[in-house]
Each structure stands twice: as C-alpha cells, then as structure tokens.
C-alpha cells in the first residue's frame, strides 16, 4: 500500500521554478540525457509491429509500449515496477516515459549546427571572424582551412582550395602545417579561440579606431564573445558530435487501416541521418579513398541540416509525395507551430458552442442555456450530486442515470447551475468585453439566448452568429468570473469609459418616439396631479403620447450618505411642462436623477449620456436595473408606436431639378474655359468634382429640410412648422438606423462615385434609389460598392495583425505599485485645429492624476491639489474657472521599473475608479487600439461606394471676436494692387481675447492674400485670408525685370500644347527625364534692376534666384517687368482622391512601427540663425549658426520647399524643410514629451475621422513600450558596450549599482523602436520567440545563455503558470516572499551550525531554476 501512495506522491510533485535558461548543450550533456544510442534506421517490425531493437522506436532505449509490461511479455503488472527484463532489456514502467526519454546518435564526423551557421548574422562567422561564404566552403568540403600554420608564412584560418593545398604541401613539405576540411576543421578553429584574449584585443581596438563601420563590427563581435564568456558556453559546442533523438511518442508512427502507416516527417529525417552515419562509419573502417569519405561526410552534414531546419540551405529534402519534410525548426515556428498552436492557443474542455438568439426577457446578468448543453457541460457536478444524494452509488451508475435523462436529473441540474456563472465568448475576441460571465437560465431549444444590451460589447447580431460557452470549474474561478467578469459588472468600455450597455435600434426608436412632442396633440395643455392620472388618461385615449401637458412629478434629491454609506434621498414635487410619454417613462428613473435628464427627445447619444450620468451618480447596481427597465420600455413602446416605412416616406425635394440644372450649366462653363485654354485639364477636373460635390450637398440639405419639418395647425389655428413624424426621418434622427448620408442616397441624389483606386469619377449619379438608376448609373455604382466588399475581406487580416503586434509589445506592462513618486508629467491643453476645439480640455484630463496644483487664474488660489484624481466634478470645476492647461501624470514618465504605477495611469476606464494593482493595462491598451481597427477602413470612406471628400478650404475666417496677431514667422509683401501677399511658409495668425488669452490660431499658407492687419480688432466671422486651393503659386519677393536661366525648351522645360485648346504653356520637366549632361542644371529666374544689374538679397551679395519646381507652369515671359508679390508660376495640386492616401489602418501601423517617412522634413539640429551658403549642383546649402558661433550645414535638394528665410532665428527641432515629420528626429531634438504628443495626435486624427473614441492614455502606454530601450553613449564603469541597446530598466539598475560603489554611471540616449522591433528585442526570449522570427531569437538566446525571468504574461502562459496580473500578481508575490523567507531560514540554520563548530551538512543552495540548461 505504501508503495502505491508513494507512486501518487511522485506524480503530484510539481516543479517550482523562477526562471528558464536556454543554452547550448555540450556533447556530454546530450549523452547524459540519452537512454541509449540509436544505431539502426529501422522503426518497427512489419510483421509483429513491435519496435526494432536499437532502432528509432526501440523499447530498450525509450521505454515500454504498454504500461508496466516489458516487450517480450516476461514481466507484467505493477509488482515488477522498475525491473529491467534480462531477455529484451526493457525497463518495466509507465508507457508515457516514451514521451520524455531521449536517445542519441554518435556522429562519425562532427557536423555544424545549421542555425548557428545560416541564421543571420552568422554566429559562427562572428566568432571566427570569417565570412559565411568561406565557412560554407570549408563545411561542405570545397576548401581547406589552415588550423596550425607552424613555421610557414600561412595565416591561421586562411582558406585554400584543394589544388592550393597540394601545391603548398609540396612547397613546405607535409606535416609542416595543419589544414583541414569540413566541420572538424571549424571545430578545431573554435577550440583554439582564447575568448579572454580576444575580448581584450577587441576592447583595445575599439578604443583605437574612429571609423563608425569598424566600431559597429567590433561591438557586434564583442557582444557575442562576451556572451560566451559570461554564460560559460564553449564555442565548439556549435559543432555537433552527438545528435539527440526526440522521444518516439513526440514523432509517432500510427498504423492506418489497410496496413499503411502514417508517420511524422521527423522519422524520415532521422532515418536519413542514421543511414548516412552508418555508411560513413563503414567507409572509415574500410579506409575508403579520401574523396568517397568526403562525399559521405558532406551528405551527413546535409542530412543533419535538413533534420534541424529543412530548406534553410540548398533544396529542401522531400518525402515520397514530393513535398518538403517538416523539420524540427518548422515544428516550433509560425501559426501552426508549438508556440502559437499548442502553448498560447490551447483548446479547453467543459465548453460548447451554439447559435445565439435574442433573449428580451433576460436580466442583464443572465443568459439562456439550452438544457441539453447544460446537461453535458455540468456532468461532473451532476454526478457528484447524484452520489451525495445516494441516488447513484458509482460514477457508472450516475452516468447511466444522466444518459436516461430522468426527471430527477433535471431537478439536480437546476440546483447545480444556480449561481454558477458560465462564460460566453464571441469570436473574434477583440477586447476584454468579448468574454463575459452570465448566470445561466435553462431553456428549451438548442440556441443560446443573449441579452440584447451586451450585443454592442460582443459586436454580436442575430443573423446566425455563434457563441461559445465555458464553465469555470474551481471555486476561485467561479468567484473571479462572478466578481470581475459578470456582464452587470462590465458596463463601461475600457477604451474610452463610455457605457457599453447602451440600447440600439428598435429600443432607441421606441424611447425616441415616446419622448417626442407634438403641436396640438389630443389633450394638449391638460394638467395632471400625478403620473398614475396621466396613465389613466392615456389608457382611456384622452391624450396622445406626444401631447404637451403639465404634470406634478416627484424627484428624489441626494441629501447625504448614512453610516453604512447608503444614500439618503429627499422627495421634491414640482409641476413640470412635459409630454405624456416622458411623464410615463419617468417612473423608471432611479432615485438621485432629476427629471430634466428625461425631459427631452431621447436620441441614441442622449440615452448614452443618460446611462453615463446614472452610473456616475447612482452607482453600478442602480444603473444596471435602470438599463434593463429602459430596454423593456423601449421594446414595448416601439411595438406600440407601429412605425413602418413606405416608398412615399422618401420625399424627393422639388428643388432638386433646379440645383442639378445649375450645376450642369457651371460644368459646361468650365468646359468652355478649358477649350479656350484659360484652365488646364487638371484644374477643370478639380472644379467639376467640386461643383458636383456642392450640388450633392445642396440636394441633400434641401431634402433634409423637407423631411425634417412638416406644417401643422396649432390650437390658435395658425399654421406652424414642427419636427416631422416621417418614419425615415425619425429613424435617422434618433440614431436607431441609417444616417443623413444614406437617406440622401434614397431620396436626394447618389452623388459622386469613387473608382477602386480612390479617384473620383467626374460624372455623378443624379438619380436616387427612389427614382431608380439607369444602366450606366448602376454600372458606375458597382465600381465602388464591390471595392468596399473586397476591402473588408482584406483589411480584417491586417487589423488582426496590428492587434497582435500591439499585444505583443505591451503584454508585460502591469500596474505593480500604487505610486512611483515622480514629479514629471505632461501639460494638457484643449486640442484646437483651425480655430475649432476638437477635443475639450475636460475630456483630455478626465480620469488623470494632477502633478502640480491647479491654480485659479482669477484669484491665484489653489483650486485642486497635486496628486488628485480628476473626476467629472473636478473637470467641471476646472472648466468653470477657466484654466487653459493642466499638468497631469502620464504612463510615459512613470518611474516604476518593471511595470507602471496606479497614479501615473489614472482611472481604469472600464471600472470608473483609480486603477487596481495587477491590472494588465498594456493588454487593455493594445485591445483598445486594435479593436476598432477593423472599422478603420482602408481609405474607403464610401457609403456603398459613394465618394466623400474633404471640401477644399480656400479661405480662413475667425470663429471668435478679438484681436489679430501674427506670429514671428509670418512674412508678407504688398503687391501692386495694394494686397498683402504671404511669403512665409510657416506663418500663423492668432486671435486673442480682451485678456490676451489665445482663442484660436490659423496657419496661413504661402501665396495667400491677407485681408487683415496685425493688431486689428475683428468680429467673429471675418475672413482673415484667401488663396487658390487648386494651385500653389511661386511669388516674387522683389520687383525687377525677369531674366530666365536654364529655361531651355526640351531640356528643362517642355512646351505643353493642349490638343483641345491649341494653346501652349511652359512646364518644368523632371530632371530624371533629362540626359546626364543636363541633369545638374535647374530652371530659375534672376531679377535685373533698371541698370540691368542682378538684384541682390538685401544685406548680402547673393543674387535673388527663384527656382522652379518640377511640374510648375511658368506664367511670366523672359524680359517681363514684375512687381513685388506677383505670381511667377503655379504648381497644380494633385487631383483629389477620396480622402487621405495613408489614411486608416496603414497610417496607424506606420506610426506605431516608427517608420521614417520618405522625403521627411528636415528639423533644425540647433538653435541659431539661418543663412544660405553657396549652392552646389542640385542642392542648396543652408547654414545654421548657433549661439556659440558654430556653423551647422544642411544640404537640401533644390526641389524641396525651404520654410525659413535668410536671417531667421530658428529653435532646435523647428521644421526648416517641408515634409512629413520623422518621429526619430522629434525624439532626438525635442524629447519624449513632444514625441508622445506627435504620435498621440496623429493616431487620434485617424480614429477621430471614423468617429472612434479612444483615450489618449492607451496610446501613451504603447509609446512607453516603444521607448523602453536606450542606446549607450558613454559606458562609464558599467558592464555595457558603447552603442549597445539595452532595456531601460536594466540600465537604471546597473547605474544604481555603479553609483552605489562610487563609480561613473553610463550615459545614454533614448531610442524609439517600432512595435515589431520592440517585441523582438524584449528581454524575454520566450515571448520574442513566440512572436516572430523564432529561429533567430532562439539562436541568439542560446548563444547568450539567456535567462528568462518570466516577468510578462506571455511567458507565464507558455510555461503554464498563473499570469503575474490580476489575482495572479498576489499569488506570485506571496510565493516569492515565501521562498525568500525559506532561504533566509536555511541560511540562519547554516550559520548557527557553523558557530557550533559542527561540520555542517551540505546544504544545496541552488534555488529553483538554476543548474542545468533547459
């Protein structure tokens, strides 16, 4: 019996470990793992199906096939456990040891491990300092390598061909030097390396050299050698002498019916290796000719290569069916590999899936579970109950009972599922709310019932969607599901803090209809004593639902909270002017909400705001009950309303004909202008598209105006307008279904259509769906509509990949402490663009913690202290006292080393309170950004292919009244007509109020005409400037006579004849299209004064030269007199595509991957004064002289737009040449805060265009992870190498250590890595390997002998432990503390024994995870 108990104990012994180390295994280590050498390629005997002895499935090496039974059958049963059979040599034990026992193959000749040879950069090449090509020639027996030059002039590791070798042997005599071929040669070279000496040498050379390339090369090699030195791995272990053999159960051979076998490819690969190895052994014994042996060695090397990584070098080995065999490397990498398929994506039992249907009668925390499904899922619980109740005595009996489905079983099922939550999941699970817990309610039928309010969170609809059910088994799991995942505890979106349980569609329509008011409805003006009276009147049809009446309504105001924290309310009765519907609806209002929140038409946005208000004021429980009541009322009222739609509801505006006729006339006018040569074809197209766009908008407006209002007679008999009760209008207005743009297509005109490439077809569809489309119109529509569908299919995959990269880069970011105590933060202002407030300050700082006191600008008193979490009331206060900017904490400046602190993160948006310790904020951020990704269409902003374009701005007007101020960068000249023409490229006009506070700012483009003066007082709506939106001018800043230079027809310019109009213009042509001789010359204009001298720039002796960009149309003639501010040429802008080219998802991905844009802007490296040096061929030379008088030169291509002028003072990081900004430059010159602003604003721009709300902090979390590595500049006394990239936390730890010892810390600069690169360069090799480029990551980690501390979530999922987040964080902390105390105790005991002069017993102090390489 005791033996049996021991057996059970032995099974439970799970291993505790703190880290996982990877390294290279020495030949001795491989032999120590092995249970025997595999000598034969045979697998199993074809007659007996028993494994062959010494073969690949040998039972003697790998263990028995049946539990506790040797192969020949001499020993069976448990009693012989551990006996080794003398006949067949098999140990009697469990058959599952065949999953863990390894074998080995003694290779007759050493072979190189292909990963260390071919995985770039080649590790073998680095260590030996040889090129990959040379090493390959040696390994594959094409050349000799010198091992020992002896007394000869040859050099060590010199390569020579066979002929050379023979010649040298003749020359110096044999035995004077040693040269070898194949892996043996490489192994000898590796053995001969003295790592310590090499490191010293390289360090010395690093000090001596100055060339960047050499430093890089040395640093790389130094890193590898130091890794070898540190990890105690010998370089010669990269050459295999012994090959381990995988346990047979992991490469199974399964008999199929019909006598055939299915086998893992690995068996084939192993067989090839064994065959070639045995043949080589035999050839060596027979002392075969060198050339034959060499060939066999080469083949062995190739067989081993294929086994490890098939297809990495040369052609892949193929099986019988001509497909490449799947090698060990393929087993672990990619989507179907070990990491992603089996470790990160396990299938779970106790789960089921079925179609979902709507469950309108359910409470929010319930779901309907089909009886049969529940019976299957809860089987173990039912069995247990049957046994405890004594109905069944054994499991078998219980099983029978359940299968016969007796009435008692259903009763027990009811009992078992009571308060046992189940988890529902809808794929794709894009964010936290994709899995929620519900209490099951048993239902008949086979479909799962889902509560309508959670559909938004699951993104589910009932058109055939399926959902999966999972049962949490343990008590802890049930508890977590109930407290953290229950649907009624997740009412806010973690992405933005808005309610997720907002009603949609019919419910919204019902509530909207109920709360609308109507002029002169039945019973208008009646007054009621209370709500029950209203209901009586309504039920007796004395009043209509929308009639305006007066009702006495009781509101409950919050007085205070009692000792238990329960709210106390005081009733307050008032007479309210309202409608019948609103009065009736007010019955469901929770206490603490005023009636005013309901006393308006409830559109979707209003309902969302209503639920939000309820949540903030009345708490979670009341809100959930309220939402459920709203839902029930909405469904009931929508049914009672009886709204339907008919074709007659789509009213076509009478003005449509006239608008279209006018537009056509305008288009004809432009065609005429084009014919007579006044405009180019491009300009004509742009104008036509604009005209039709405007016409479409006008028709839409006329249609909406007609739909919106209807004429009714009021009580006095006057005809008045009231909001329409047109069904289609109500659906769109309430937000239940459809939008103005869709109604426009139904009843207005469909408008312009886009081609699949995004360009707009200039003939619009003037018809709408009510009138019907003709064949041509239908054909044009199909274009865009089909592209929309194709796009959707393609972009889903892209969006998923973005989410995956984001999750991978942030997965180890968890809130680990309450406060890191930093005093850094970021100043938040309202986001203003073009004078419009896009995002108010209150929205940006809500849920953040203040860094500094917030001061009232009027009284200068402290309004809010530092370290306060800003909630709704406090941001309201900030709004009211008129604070313009607030400094708040941000994840970017958090000082916590491994993780984040709660104060820097602020409010957990999904819960509405300060974030808890252990929250995996990284993953939440990744999900919040990735989840709407699918909605970010790839620049198809089509509604069924209809084109929508940003109307081109051609003027700017003031929104506020105040005073105009121009910034210092604004420069303008007065032209002959007395107009002010702007000649600066970065000038801005500000408008300030009476207190001098900036209200708005507008960029004024180059070439615009200013309509106001600096310092002028203006009213709101005043135009500040106008410009031509369709062309960019080149303006002369000086007056004089034109003198063309290099304007040669056919060389730099071309005469463009318009075939239609017969007129010609000069167009500057692209330098690439010219011949080599003429490439350097650029067309330009010089100005001559009255004496024929060149006009100079004032204060310099440079002549005024004005260059023309490619594509410019020159509008002046040679010798023409020009005035200041006159246009010399115009550059037509690109034709309008549908919105922005890099819109949507690609733009977001580009920002997070931190890609440098092509033709990036040039930023000033220093603060100083600009001047122009001598131009070189094709480049202009811009010089910035800093404050110390040092000159910094920039060479800029001539076609680039320089934004600064001579003598301008620029600040470090200011843009001096136009172009898209490069995030790396922003980081280097302006710092982390500016970079964060840039990325956050750019990402938000993309999402905002789609109407998606994401809180800034999520993007900041990602940026923090992109900035987590730094580059060492000066190593000080630390262990780093110059130019090395290390984890910020590691560097800070090392610097702390060095400073503590009184030495010099390292200096560093910040690095910005794209998300893919950041994921791959993480400290955890397990996480990186499971992400991408598995081979490269593992190769590097093995050479470095890396240790994975299992800090992140992913690593812990992979090794199968609780993740260090949420409840798992507490578990891991407790475990670590326990271990530390045990270690201390062991130490104390050891010291005590020492003091007693007793010879202490050997205490093994290897903590978990130390010791052997894994």
UniProtKB/Swiss-Prot annotation:
GO terms for biological process: DNA-templated transcription. One of its GO terms (cellular component) is DNA-directed RNA polymerase complex. Zn(2+) 1 binds at residues 70, 72, 85, 88. Its EC number is 2.7.7.6. Pfam families: RNA_pol_Rpb1_1, RNA_pol_Rpb1_2, RNA_pol_Rpb1_3, RNA_pol_Rpb1_4, RNA_pol_Rpb1_5. InterPro entries: DNA-dir_RpoC_beta_prime, DNA-dir_RpoC_beta_prime_bact, RNA_pol_asu, RNA_pol_N, RNA_pol_Rpb1_1, RNA_pol_Rpb1_3, RNA_pol_Rpb1_3_sf, RNA_pol_Rpb1_4. Binds 1 Mg(2+) ion per subunit. The RNAP catalytic core consists of 2 alpha, 1 beta, 1 beta' and 1 omega subunit. When a sigma factor is associated with the core the holoenzyme is formed, which can initiate transcription. This is DNA-directed RNA polymerase subunit beta'.
């Amino acid at each position: 019996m005791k033996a049996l108990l021991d057996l059970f104990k032995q099974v439970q012994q799970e291993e505790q470990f703190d880290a996982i180390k990877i390294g290279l295994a020495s030949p001795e280590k491989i032999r120590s793992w092995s249970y025997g050498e595999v000598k034969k390629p045979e697998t199993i005997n074809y007659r007996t199906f028993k494994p062959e002895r010494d073969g690949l499935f040998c039972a003697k090496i790998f263990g028995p096939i049946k539990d506790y039974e040797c192969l020949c059958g001499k020993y069976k049963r448990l009693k012989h456990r551990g006996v080794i059979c003398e006949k067949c040599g098999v140990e009697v034990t469990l058959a599952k040891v065949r999953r863990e026992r390894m074998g080995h193959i003694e290779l007759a000749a050493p072979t190189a491990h292909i990963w260390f040879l071919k995985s770039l950069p080649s590790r073998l090449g680095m260590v030996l300092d040889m090129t990959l090509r040379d090493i390959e020639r040696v390994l594959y027996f094409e050349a000799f390598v010198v091992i020992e030059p002896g007394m000869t002039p040859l050099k060590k590791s010199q390569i020579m061909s066979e002929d050379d070798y023979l010649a040298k042997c003749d020359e110096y005599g044999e035995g004077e030097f040693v040269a070898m071929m194949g892996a043996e040669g490489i192994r000898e070279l590796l053995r001969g390396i003295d790592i310590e000496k090499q490191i010293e040498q390289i360090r010395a050379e690093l000090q001596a050299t100055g060339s960047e390339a050499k430093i890089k090369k040395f640093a790389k090699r130094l890193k590898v050698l130091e890794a070898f030195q540190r990890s105690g791995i010998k370089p010669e272990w990269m050459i295999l002498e012994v090959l381990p053999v995988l346990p047979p159960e992991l490469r199974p051979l399964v008999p199929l019916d019909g006598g055939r076998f299915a086998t893992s490819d690995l068996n084939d690969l192993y067989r090839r290796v064994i065959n070639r190895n045995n043949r080589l052994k035999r050839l060596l014994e027979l002392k075969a000719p060198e050339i034959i042996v060499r060939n066999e060695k080469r083949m062995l090397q190739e067989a081993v290569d294929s086994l490890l990584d098939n297809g990495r070098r040369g052609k892949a080995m193929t099986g019988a069916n001509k497909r490449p065999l799947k090698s060990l490397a393929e087993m672990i990498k990619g989507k179907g590999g070990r990491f992603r398929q089996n470790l990160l994506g396990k299938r779970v039992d106790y789960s089921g899936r079925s179609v979902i249907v709507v469950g309108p009668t359910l409470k929010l925390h319930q779901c309907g579970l089909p009886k049969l499904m529940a019976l299957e899922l809860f089987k173990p619980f039912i069995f247990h109950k049957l046994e405890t109740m004594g109905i069944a005595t054994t499991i078998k009996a219980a099983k029978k009972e359940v299968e016969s489905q007796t009435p008692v079983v259903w009763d027990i099922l009811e009992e078992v599922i009571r308060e046992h939550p189940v988890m529902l999941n809808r794929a794709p699970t894009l964010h936290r709310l994709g899995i929620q817990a519900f209490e099951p309610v048993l239902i008949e039928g086979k479909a799962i019932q889902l509560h309508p309010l959670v559909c938004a969170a699951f993104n589910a609809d009932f058109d055939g969607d399926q959902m999966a059910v999972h049962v949490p088994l343990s008590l802890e799991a049930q508890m977590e599901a109930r407290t953290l995942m229950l649907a009624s505890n997740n009412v806010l979106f973690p992405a933005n803090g808005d309610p997720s349980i907002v009603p949609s569609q019919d419910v919204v329509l019902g509530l909207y209809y109920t709360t609308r008011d109507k002029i002169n409805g039945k019973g208008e003006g009646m007054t009621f004593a209370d709500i029950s009276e209203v209901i009586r009147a309504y039920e007796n049809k004395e009043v209509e639902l929308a009639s305006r009446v007066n009702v006495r309504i009781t509101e409950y105001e919050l007085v205070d909270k009692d000792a238990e924290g329960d709210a106390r309310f005081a009733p307050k009765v008032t007479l309210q002017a309202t409608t019948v519907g609103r009065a009736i609806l007010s019955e469901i209002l929770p206490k603490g909400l005023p009636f005013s929140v309901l006393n308006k038409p409830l559109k979707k946005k209003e309902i969302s705001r209503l639920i939000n208000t309820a949540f903030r004021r009345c708490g979670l429980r009341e809100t959930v009950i309220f939402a459920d009541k709203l839902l029930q009322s909405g469904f009931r009222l929508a049914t009672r309303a009886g709204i339907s739609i008919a074709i007659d509801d789509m009213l076509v505006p009478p003005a449509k004909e006239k608008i279209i006729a006018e537009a056509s006339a305008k288009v004809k006018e432009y065609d005429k202008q084009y014919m007579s040569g006044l405009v180019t074809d491009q300009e004509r197209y742009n104008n036509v598209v604009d005209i039709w766009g405007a016409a479409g908008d006008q028709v839409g407006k006329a249609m909406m105006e007609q739909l919106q209002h209807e004429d009714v007679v009021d009580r006095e008999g006057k005809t008045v307008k009231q909001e329409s009760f047109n069904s289609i209008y109500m659906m769109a207005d309430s937000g239940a279904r459809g939008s103005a743009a869709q109604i426009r297509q139904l009843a207005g005109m469909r408008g312009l259509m886009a081609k699949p490439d995004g360009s707009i077809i200039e003939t619009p569809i003037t018809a709408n769906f009510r009138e019907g489309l003709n064949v041509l119109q239908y054909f044009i529509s199909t274009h865009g509509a089909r592209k929309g569908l194709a796009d959707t299919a393609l972009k889903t995959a892209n969006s998923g990949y973005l989410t995956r990269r984001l999750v991978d880069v942030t997965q180890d970011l968890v809130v680990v402490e309450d406060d890191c105590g930093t005093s850094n933060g970021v100043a938040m202002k309202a986001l203003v663009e073009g004078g419009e407030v896009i995002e108010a300050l209150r929205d940006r700082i809500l849920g953040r913690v203040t860094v500094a006191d917030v001061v009232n600008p009027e009284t200068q008193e402290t309004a809010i202290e530092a370290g306060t979490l800003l909630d709704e009331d406090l941001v309201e206060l900030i709004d009211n006292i008129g604070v313009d900017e607030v400094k708040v904490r941000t994840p970017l400046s958090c000082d916590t080393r491994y993780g984040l602190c709660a104060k820097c993160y602020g409010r957990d948006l999904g819960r509405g309170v300060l974030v808890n310790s252990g929250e995996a904020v990284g993953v939440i951020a990744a999900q919040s950004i990735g989840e709407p990704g699918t909605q970010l269409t790839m620049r198809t902003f089509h509604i069924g292919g209809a084109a929508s374009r940003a109307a081109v701005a051609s003027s700017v007007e003031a929104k506020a009244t105040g005073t105009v101020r121009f910034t210092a960068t604004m420069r303008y000249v007065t032209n002959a007509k007395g107009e002010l023409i702007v000649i600066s490229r970065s000038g801005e006009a500000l408008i300030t109020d009476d207190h001098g506070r900036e209200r708005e700012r507008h960029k004024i483009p180059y070439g615009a005409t200013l309509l106001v003066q600096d310092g002028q007082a203006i009213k709101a709506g005043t135009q500040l400037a106008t410009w031509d939106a369709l062309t960019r001018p080149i303006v002369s800043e000086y007056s004089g006579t034109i003198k063309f230079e290099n304007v040669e027809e056919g060389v730099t310019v071309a005469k463009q004849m318009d075939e239609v109009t017969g007129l010609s213009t000069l167009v500057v042509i692209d330098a690439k299209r010219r011949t080599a001789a003429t490439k350097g010359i650029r067309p330009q204009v010089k100005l001559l004064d009255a004496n024929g001298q060149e006009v100079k720039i004032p204060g310099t002796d440079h002549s005024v030269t004005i260059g023309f960009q490619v594509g410019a149309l020159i509008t002046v003639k040679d010798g023409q007199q020009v005035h200041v501010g006159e246009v010399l040429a115009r550059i037509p802008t690109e034709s309008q595509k549908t919105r922005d080219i890099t819109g949507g998802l690609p733009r977001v991905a580009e920002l997070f991957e931190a890609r440098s844009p092509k033709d990036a802007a040039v930023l000033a490296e220093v603060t100083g004064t600009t001047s122009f040096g001598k131009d070189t061929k094709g480049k202009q030379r811009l010089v910035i002289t800093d404050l110390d008088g040092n000159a910094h030169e920039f060479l800029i291509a001539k076609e680039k737009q320089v934004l600064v002028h001579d003598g301008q003072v620029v600040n470090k990081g200011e843009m001096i040449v136009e172009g898209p900004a490069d995030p790396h430059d922003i980081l280097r010159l302006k710092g982390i805060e500016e970079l964060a602003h840039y990325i956050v604003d750019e990402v938000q721009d993309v999402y905002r265009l789609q109407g998606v709300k994401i809180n800034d902090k999520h993007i900041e979390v990602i940026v923090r992870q992109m900035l987590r590595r730094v580059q060492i500049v000066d190593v000080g006394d630390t262990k780093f190498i110059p130019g090395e990239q290390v984890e910020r936390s590691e560097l800070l730890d090392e610097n702390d250590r060095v400073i503590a010892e009184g030495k010099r810390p390292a200096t560093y600069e910040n690095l910005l890595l794209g998300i893919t690169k950041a994921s791959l360069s993480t400290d955890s090799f397990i996480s990186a390997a499971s992400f991408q480029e598995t081979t490269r990551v593992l190769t590097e980690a093995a050479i470095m002998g890396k240790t994975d501390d299992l800090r992140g979530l992913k690593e812990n999922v992979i090794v199968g432990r609780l993740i260090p987040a949420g409840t798992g964080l507490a578990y891991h902390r407790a475990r670590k503390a326990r271990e530390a105390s045990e270690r201390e105790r062991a130490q104390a005991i050891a010291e005590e024994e020492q003091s007693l002069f007793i010879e202490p017993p050997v205490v093994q102090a290897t903590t978990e995870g130390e010791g052997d390489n894994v």
